[in-house]
UniProtKB/Swiss-Prot annotation:
It comes from Pseudoalteromonas atlantica (strain T6c / ATCC BAA-1087). Belongs to the GTP cyclohydrolase I family. Its EC number is 3.5.4.16. This is GTP cyclohydrolase 1. Toroid-shaped homodecamer, composed of two pentamers of five dimers. The keyword Iron does not apply. It catalyses: GTP + H2O = 7,8-dihydroneopterin 3'-triphosphate + formate + H(+). GO terms for biological process: one-carbon metabolic process; tetrahydrobiopterin biosynthetic process; tetrahydrofolate biosynthetic process. Pathway: Cofactor biosynthesis; 7,8-dihydroneopterin triphosphate biosynthesis; 7,8-dihydroneopterin triphosphate from GTP: step 1/1. PANTHER family: GTP CYCLOHYDROLASE 1, GTP CYCLOHYDROLASE I.
Amino acid sequence: MSDDLTQHYSQILSILGEDTQRGGLVDTPKRAAKAMQFLTDGYEKNLNDVVNGAIFEADTDEMVVIQNIEYYSLCEHHILPFIGQCHIAYLPQGKVLGLSKFARIVDMYARRLQIQEGLTKQIADAIQEVTGAAGVGVIMEGKHMCMMMRGVQKQNSSMVTSVMLGAMRKSDATRNEFLRLIGK
């Protein structure tokens, strides 16, 4: 795939009128291909491998919150970056997920061509699937380069999406506890 991407990036540069043999551009197609592979390596991962058995028995049913997980992704409409923070809460039912796995789940889905709305849902569904939690909440904040660099060019715009599952959706008190804990 890397050779194909390199060739396509070279063609794109040529179509734009650039000289691909110019000093600063000689290795650009190769670097761009490598960057694109890294930015989309989520396609090569699956939930079971990412979790890697890191589900642990725990005598707790109280809310667990992981906040300010940084992420970056590429929007599926313009292939431009969007970046932000993800906040996750879940209500364990005798099992907890290893802490680093939350960030790994976020990265796995973020490193695919995405929209933030879909990314938020994928993360919530994945956490629900692997933990069997009584409730899951995911809130994502993002700044989208497709809004900032092109089109309407609104530099201070941001987007917030949320998905609430189970008790997080059904109980106002539980949802409000999550929002309070993350300062929203």
